[in-house]
Amino acid sequence: MKIKDFTVGQVVYAFSYEDIALLKGLKPKKYTVAKIGRKYLYAARGEEVNIKTVPDNLLIGFKEPDYTDDFLEENIDYGYKAILFPDMEIAKDYYHKRKLVRFLASGVKWESYTLDELKEIQKILGVQV
């Protein structure tokens, strides 16, 4: 996801990265995109916001993270960052992906499967060991 994919005036959805990492559910905060720069996107809290009247100190900056293209992250140095999505559908897909990754990493008892079943899973995933 790139900054140029957003437009000024667009309603976007932010989530605490902590909530998504710990699978606490999707509790969105709605923001309105106020400014778009080369490195940062600035958004104002709320859905029905007149972005021309919001002072700069109330705008929250978001940037493209180096490690993923799935979302934008809040530009802060400490604490839990908020992550920004252009719509709820993309946010739900990302949350579902995190749940599946966690489930497949720790929720499945792989030892209970036979060798043939594990080889079939390996074929489906297309990975070599």
Regions found by a protein language model. Give the residues of each.
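Short coil-to-beta transition motif at edge beta-strands of beta-rich domains
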Residues: 1-24
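Cystatin/cathelin-like cysteine-protease inhibitor module
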Residues: 7-9, 13-15, 43, 113, ...
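Residue-level detector of intrinsically disordered, flexible termini
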Residues: 13, 33, 42-43, 90
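Short beta-strand-centered aromatic/proline hotspots
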Residues: 23-38
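Short, solvent-exposed secondary-structure boundary/capping segments
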Residues: 39-47
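Intrinsically disordered, low-complexity, charged/polar segments
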Residues: 46-129
